[in-house]
């Protein structure tokens, strides 16, 4: 199993501050670090809910601990358009600038990709989690899974979460 250690910039039932997200997440990672069947990943939610400062810390930790970074990225056209308007850059470009586009990255969704972004994923060793049912429910487009695969990107199947997937059924994802 892979347990994602959530990181987000606002309070939830799990943590009240950015530092608490990191502290609690790293405590979970330490608890399971020698378990052969349980891995951990840093799981910043998405570019629009995590600051550059947090992403910089995430990059350092992922490198130091040699653990993946699980990130919802290019989930919808709206996310990409909002980011371009607010920051002047596509979310993927922001992640490149922050040093997160590398072989630690598991990019979830990736429905809005350019050819150059696909090539960059392949070159960097990024993995993509394709969440077909969630993307259908959100009407957000599809990950170009076959183009990614042909480019040499590792493409996996994902479900996303309960808010955007009615059953979290991996076999259903395979049929979609």
What are these regions (language model features)?
Residues 77-89, 117-122, 139-148, 165-176:
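Histidine/acidic-residue-rich catalytic or RNA/ligand-binding cores of hydrolases
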Residues 97-104, 146-176:
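His/Asp/Glu-enriched, well-ordered alpha-helical/loop segment
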Residues 42, 72, 107, 121, ...:
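Divalent metal-coordination and catalytic microenvironments
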Residues 59-68, 100-103, 120-129, 150-155:
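Glycine-enriched alpha-helix->loop->beta-strand junction motifs that scaffold or abut catalytic
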Residues 1-111:
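Metal-coordinating catalytic core of metallo-dependent amide/deamination hydrolases
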Residues 49-50, 136-138:
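Acidic-and-aromatic substrate-binding clefts and catalytic sites of carbohydrate-active enzymes
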Residues 5-10, 75, 132-136, 161-163:
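Short, acidic/turn-prone active-site loops that include or flank metal/cofactor-
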Residues 104-114, 131-137:
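Catalytic beta/alpha-barrel core
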């Amino acid at each position: 199993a892979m347990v994602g250690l959530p990181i987000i910039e606002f309070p939830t039932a799990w943590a009240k501050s950015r530092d608490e997200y990191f502290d609690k997440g790293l405590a979970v990672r330490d608890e399971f670090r020698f378990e052969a069947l349980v891995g951990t990943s840093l799981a910043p939610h998405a570019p629009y809910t995590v600051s550059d400062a947090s992403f910089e810390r995430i990059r350092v930790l992922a490198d130091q601990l040699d653990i993946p970074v699980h990130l919802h990225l290019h989930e919808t056209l709206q996310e990409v358009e909002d980011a371009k308007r607010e920051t002047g850059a596509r979310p993927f470009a922001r992640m490149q600038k922050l040093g997160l586009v590398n072989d630690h990255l598991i990019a979830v969704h990736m429905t809005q990709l350019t050819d150059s972004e696909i090539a960059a994923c392949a070159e960097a060793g990024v993995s993509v989690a394709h969440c077909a049912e969630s993307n259908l429910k959100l009407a957000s487009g599809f990950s170009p899974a076959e183009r990614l695969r042909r480019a040499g990107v590792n493409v996996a199947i994902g479900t996303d979460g309960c808010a955007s997937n009615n059953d979290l059924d991996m076999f259903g994802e395979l049929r979609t």
